[in-house]
């Protein structure tokens, strides 16, 4: 059994970048970094860092199914979201964690979105929602550089905080 498993799902590469940062910060050699969509058997670990990309305010069914199957583990969540961090997201995802696990905390940073999202925003524009669409497009444009170096550093600080809570 591994000490640490960094398991992630990444549609655009954003969450994969944060996963690699988290993995590099974990001590020792008893660790692995795996895409949840792998065909390989996912090994057991004492501590799971589980990453996801946010779609419609939560994680995918693959991630929620994996979370709900864990028992007696220490779990930290991380993710990327085009709209940025929101405690609501972490709450919705952590709800899949069974009570016999130790939920350590979460880290979410902004991630770039596909160009089709910007095009969808533009197609939704009306006189009534013009200001709201402007804010969505402004956020989209700000997200283009994320996750950036500062996000990566914040992910490492997150790991440092989680390591203080972890019992191996």
Feature-to-residue mapping (PLM):
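Short acidic low-complexity segments
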Residues: 32-44
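N-terminal beta1-alpha1 ligand-phosphate binding loop
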Residues: 2-25
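General secondary-structure propensity
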Residues: 1-8, 139-145
């Amino acid at each position: 059994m591994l000490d640490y498993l960094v398991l992630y799902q990444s549609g655009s590469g954003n969450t994969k970048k944060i996963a690699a940062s988290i993995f590099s910060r974990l001590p020792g050699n008893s660790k692995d970094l795996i895409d949840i969509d792998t065909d390989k058997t996912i090994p057991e670990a004492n501590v799971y860092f589980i990453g996801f990309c946010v779609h419609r305010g939560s994680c995918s069914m693959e991630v929620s199914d994996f979370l709900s199957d864990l028992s007696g583990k220490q779990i930290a969540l991380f993710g990327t979201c085009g709209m940025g961090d929101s405690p609501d997201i972490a709450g919705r995802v952590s709800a899949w964690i069974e009570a016999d696990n130790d939920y350590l905390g979460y880290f979410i940073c902004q991630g770039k979105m596909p160009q089709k999202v910007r095009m969808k925003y533009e197609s939704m524009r009306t006189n009534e929602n013009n200001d709201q669409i402007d804010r969505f497009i402004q956020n989209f444009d700000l997200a283009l550089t994320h996750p950036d170096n500062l996000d990566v550093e914040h992910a490492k600080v997150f790991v440092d905080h989680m390591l203080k809570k972890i019992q191996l």
